[in-house]
């Protein structure tokens, strides 16, 4: 039972991190669609702040043993790729 609870906590922690990553992607989409251009300092600051916050969340979860370091890095890498593709699509308009 204890190992099931540990697995459940690990799964829940990773799911919460994925939700936070998706929130960042949605926030940047809204910003690009409605508010600012990717070259705008406000856009860059929001993106940097959000990515830094997520990286700290992931680091904390890794240190607690709730998320594997590789999985955390993969999550950040995937988000960075998605944001890059979004940026490229926006600037190609």
UniProtKB/Swiss-Prot annotation:
Pfam annotation, one family: DUF1507
InterPro entries for the chain: UPF0358, UPF0358_sf
Domain of life: Bacteria
Transmembrane intervals: none
Family according to the record: Belongs to the UPF0358 family.
Protein function: Essential for cell growth and for normal cell shape.
Name assigned to this protein: UPF0358 protein YlaN
Organism: Bacillus subtilis (strain 168)
Species lineage: Bacteria, Bacillati, Bacillota, Bacilli, Bacillales
Protein's gene: ylaN
